[in-house]
C-alpha cells in the first residue's frame, strides 16, 4: 500500500542512509586523515591512531543501519510489512544513537541533529503513512 507520507518517509530514510554511508566512509576509511579526525573532535594524529579500530567498527554499524534504511525505503513498493519493519527499526536506531550522542556530549548537538533529524522525519512520516492506510 502506498500513501504520500510513506513516500516522504522513504525519501527521508534514503537521506538518512546517505548521511550514514558518508559517516561510514569517514570513520572506517578516512579516520587517520587530519581533515576527518578534526570533524570528530580528535585533537591529534596520535589520538586518531589510538582510536582507529573503534572508529572502524563504529563506521560499520553506521553502514549496516544505512543498508537497513535504504532497503526499507526501496521495498515500500514491494513488501510493505518488511519495508516498514526495516525502515522503522533502522531509522529509530539512528534517532536513538543521536539522542545518546547529545546526552553523552551536549556540545555534539550539531552532529546529533545531522544524524538524527532525517531518520526522525522518516519514522514520523512512515507511521503517519501506515495509519493512513485504509
Q: Where are the regions that the model predicts?
A:
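Membrane-interface helix-boundary signature
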Residues: 2-12, 48-51, 80-87, 108-111
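Transmembrane helix-loop-helix
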Residues: 71-117
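Juxtamembrane boundary at the C-terminal end of a transmembrane helix
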Residues: 124-134
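Core segments of transmembrane alpha-helices
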Residues: 58-70, 118-119
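Cytosolic, membrane-interface loops and tails of multi-pass inner-membrane proteins
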Residues: 28-51
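Interfacial helix-start motif at the membrane-water boundary
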Residues: 46-64
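N-terminal signal-anchor transmembrane alpha helix
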Residues: 7-29
Amino acid at each position: 500500500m502506498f500513501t504520500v507520507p510513506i513516500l516522504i518517509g522513504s525519501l527521508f530514510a534514503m537521506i538518512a542512509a546517505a548521511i550514514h554511508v558518508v559517516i561510514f566512509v569517514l570513520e572506517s576509511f578516512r579516520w587517520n586523515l587530519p581533515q576527518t579526525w578534526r570533524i570528530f573532535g580528535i585533537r591529534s594524529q596520535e589520538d586518531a591512531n589510538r582510536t582507529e579500530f573503534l572508529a572502524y567498527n563504529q563506521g560499520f554499524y553506521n553502514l549496516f543501519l544505512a543498508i537497513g534504511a535504504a532497503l526499507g525505503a526501496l521495498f515500500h513498493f514491494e513488501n510493505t510489512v518488511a519495508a516498514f519493519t526495516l525502515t522503522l527499526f533502522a531509522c529509530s536506531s539512528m534517532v536513538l544513537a543521536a539522542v545518546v550522542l547529545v546526552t553523552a556530549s551536549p556540545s555534539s548537538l550539531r552532529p546529533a541533529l545531522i544524524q538524527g533529524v532525517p531518520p526522525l522525519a522518516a519514522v514520523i512520516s512512515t507511521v503517519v503513512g501506515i495509519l493512513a492506510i485504509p
